[in-house]
A protein has these predicted regions:
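A short glycine-rich, Lys/Arg-flanked "PGG" loop and its adjoining helix->strand segment in the class I
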Residues: 170-182
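A short acidic, Gly/Pro-enriched loop at the edge of an enzyme's catalytic core
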Residues: 145-157
Length: 279
């Protein structure tokens, strides 16, 4: 039986509310459960990066120490994002620091006056504090949408592959602007799926900061994923419990492969690099 117009409208509202509820629950699962689980499974193997990776053509060739070389493609995403401005002698905040590999590398390589890594994952912060003993580097547990710092505390804020999980992304942008000093920068890299790109663009356009640059980096991230293929296999084997390998590993590999294909083929996913400045 065909729905009447008011019934269709009500049905649309219900579907919209259901989608909002699903997205809220999914974000809560990732923020409160999944990443703590990942820390529990991956910390014993000293996994200090959780991003997709990045490589240019021709290759970037960032000089790395032997101890950093095996994390090259993860590091290069951090390097390309952070070097949009000069961080030497600056006070830097990273929101969504994960397992701290990027924070450690940038502190050692770019010589900021101080570097603070913030994450909501308490297990991850405990791991970072134990794993990364670098002068000028510290880690704080906290919420990206309620940054636990005074106004105008930092010269730069770094945010990489994290904001797609924030329930109130505009609130995050407002908090970044609040803790930045005048003239400070947001150095930002993340992705959105097709259904969220228009909203993302509108939210960034309304940000209380001026956009200095933006760049689509799908090809570079896909290339990084290709170079890290062995890492993905090892991580999936570590994350999926042994009893579930027979039925859960293949779907996990397929999800990663679909993301790679979408980035490589110009599909529905867009990964972008941005630089913003506070007036």
């Amino acid at each position: 039986m065909a729905l009447k117009s008011h019934e269709r409208g009500f049905s649309g509202v219900l579907v919209g509310k259901a989608n909002e509820t699903y997205e809220t629950c999914a974000r809560a699962f990732y923020k409160k459960i999944l990443y703590r689980y990942l820390t529990h499974r991956l910390a014993p193997d000293d996994v200090v990066f959780l991003n997709y990776g990045y490589e240019e053509d021709p290759p970037m060739g960032v000089p790395l120490s032997p101890s950093d070389e095996h994390n090259r493609f993860f590091i290069q995403l951090y390097h390309r994002t952070a070097t949009q401005v000069d961080l030497n002698g600056k006070h830097v905040l990273e929101v969504g620091c994960g397992h701290g590999g990027g924070a450690s590398y940038l502190t050692r390589a770019l010589h900021p006056a101080s570097y603070t890594g913030l994450d909501l994952n308490s297990a991850g912060i405990a791991f970072c504090r134990e794993r990364h003993q670098v002068a000028g580097l510290n880690f704080v547990e906290g919420d990206a949408e309620q940054l636990p710092f005074p106004d105008e505390s930092f010269d730069a804020v770094i945010n990489i592959e994290s904001s797609h999980l924030y329930a109130q992304f505009p609130q995050f942008l407002a908090e970044v602007a609040r803790v930045l000093r005048p003239g400070g920068h947001l150095l930002y890299a993340d992705f959105r799926f097709a259904g969220g790109i228009a909203t993302w663009e509108a939210q960034l356009a309304d940000a209380p900061m001026r956009m200095l640059s933006q760049r689509l980096i799908n090809a570079e991230v896909a290339r990084g994923m290709e170079n890290n293929s062995h890492w993905w296999v090892a991580v999936m084997n570590a994350v999926v419990p042994a009893f579930a390998h027979s039925f859960a590993l293949v779907p996990s590999y397929q999800r990663v492969w679909k993301t790679h294909q979408s980035l490589q083929d110009g599909g529905p996913t867009e990964y972008r690099l941005y630089c913003f400045q506070k007036a």
